């Protein structure tokens, strides 16, 4: 059964951390819905290599419409974490025991949502102290799968491992 993947994304996301997983998800015939503040917006990655058209506003997004959540890294998670609507969405997604896929800086959004305590995730150089203080259990490896719920990767260099693991989870 093909899965429905929500992507929380706004300006300054890490280009490859959006484009490569989304391309792989679509190639495996999963649907992808880009969510931001307003449907119809166009957001750009840090390297300006790609633009993303927003399919649905956060106000119209329900966790019940999706099977998994992707949060690309870059500066996007820092912008999203100051908006309670995105924090609420992530918190309820985690509480519903649905898989969350995160690259590099995206765990800070889960930290803001209060759903990182005791979770095993990969260690990102610039955020590891904050994540440790929030109670995350950090690992310095390419990808970490915490019970098929939290799948994380350190950086764009680890994307092949990340994509492989997320596709396994989507096939379940």
Where are each of the predicted segments found?
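Extended, subdomain-level signal for the structured scaffold at the beginning of enzyme domains
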Residues: 1-100, 109-117, 128-172
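Catalytic nucleophile serine of serine hydrolases
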Residues: 104
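Anionic-ligand binding patches
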Residues: 121
């Amino acid at each position: 059964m093909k899965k429905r993947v929500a992507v929380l994304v706004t300006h300054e996301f890490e280009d490859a951390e959006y484009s490569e997983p989304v391309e792989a998800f679509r190639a495996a015939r999963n649907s992808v819905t880009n969510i931001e503040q307003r449907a119809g917006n166009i957001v750009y990655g840090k390297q300006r290599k790609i633009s993303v058209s927003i399919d649905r506003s956060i106000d119209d997004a329900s966790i019940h419409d999706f099977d998994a959540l992707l949060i690309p890294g870059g500066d996007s998670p820092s912008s999203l974490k100051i908006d309670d609507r995105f924090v609420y969405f992530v918190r309820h997604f985690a509480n519903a025991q649905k898989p969350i896929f995160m690259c590099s800086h995206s765990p800070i959004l889960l930290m803001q949502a209060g759903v990182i305590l005791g979770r095993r995730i990969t260690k990102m150089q610039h955020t590891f102290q904050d994540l440790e203080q929030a109670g995350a259990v950090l690992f310095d490896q390419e990808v970490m799968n915490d019970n098929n719920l939290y799948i994380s990767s350190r950086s764009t260099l680890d994307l092949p491992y990340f994509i492989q693991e997320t596709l396994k989870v989507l096939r379940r």
